[in-house]
Amino acid sequence: MSKLAYFAIVAAMLAANAPAAAQGLSEPKAREIIGPWYSLFNVVTRGDVKAIQEQVLTADYESCSGYLPGECWGRDTSIKVVSNFSNSIPDMKFDIKEVLVVGDRVVVRGEVTGTPAGELFGVPHTGKSFRMMAIDIQTIRDGKIAKTFHMENWLSALGQLRAK
């Protein structure tokens, strides 16, 4: 086998196993993949939480909040957590402000707004609304979200709800 043929075979094998970006994960494609996920946080217009999550999340999906080291949960728990937002923050909205694609990772900077229907994380109901920033790092595998690292500025949101 010639060196050229050998390198062509090696290059083809590497390309088949390359990260999503090398295979063409563009910002529009990333938005197409993550869009249904973020629609779930727009409580007023969202669809069936379980069906959408099963459509866009891998079976072994992990959601890692970063609030406690190593704290991650799977797709079934994520379905429950997201479903509960409709009760606690019935007008919740997630507005995507920026999307960056790096390899198989999609970084999303968003703004979350809402008005709690009752007590939220120990803060009594005040009727006030909040606005906070959220940052997510999504790992994409086979056209689905496989892992999410997310951080929301709940401290800011709770401060707004407590303000006089």
How would you describe each model-predicted region?
Residues Q23, A146-K164:
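Low-complexity, intrinsically disordered terminal/linker segments enriched in charged
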Residues A18-A22:
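Sec/Tat signal peptide C-region and signal peptidase I cleavage site
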Residues V99-V107, T139-A146:
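A short, structured loop/turn motif at beta-sheet edges
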Residues V112, I135, M151-N153:
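Residue-level structural signal for beta-strand termini and adjacent loop
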Residues M1-A8:
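Bacterial N-terminal signal peptides that target proteins for export
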